[in-house]
Amino acid sequence: GASALAIKPPKGSAFGCPTPPMMPKLHQACLVVGPRGAGKTTAVVNLVERLPFDRIFVISPSMKSNKELMDRLKIDLQDVFEDPDDIGALDAVKVAIDAERDDLERHLAEMRRYKWLMKEINSDKPHYRLDAGDLSDFWSSRAGNFMEPKHKWGGRRPCCALIIDDAMGSQLYSKPRRLNQFTIYH
């Protein structure tokens, strides 16, 4: 019957970042179009400010000169690419996002090791069988105890944004295949 054809969505959320009510759900690709002076950048900054982004990348020839917007969004200068004709900027953003992923995977692996070590220490098994490397990796002489591994985003997947501004007519849009691929796959 009809129940055999029922669609079963995958478990978990399709949205990687928790989004406040009354805000567009993340992840998304958002295009803001308007004539010069229409307030496009201001609108994007106000939207991005209200969303839970941990790291914001920018490709724009004018963003570094707009200190107020940079400060409001807490954008790190290393995440700003000023030349929209440099197609390598997309590669640099991808490398940075991949590094965030790798850091999270490293942290999750460390947490598994840490939890296993704590379970072993608190068990009735002889402690001399524990690996010295595991013991030293998590021991803090300052705290005088074993310390849980730390992650800059608290062990969760970071929410990242890419803002491309003042790039009309640049190589970024002239060779859109790279930008399209980046947008679709990330």
Kindly label every feature range from the protein language model.
Residues 16-18, 28-50, 61-65, 87, ...:
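Conserved P-loop NTPase motor cores
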Residues 1-19, 63, 73, 85:
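N-terminal pre-Walker A segment at the start of P-loop NTPase domains
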Residues 53-54, 78-82, 185-186:
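Short, surface-exposed linear patches
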Residues 52-75, 88:
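AAA+/P-loop NTPase substrate/partner-engagement loops
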Residues 74-76, 180-181:
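Glycine-rich, phosphate-binding/catalytic loops in enzymes
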Residues 76-94:
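Short acidic-hydrophobic, aromatic-tinged amphipathic segments that line or gate anion-handling sites
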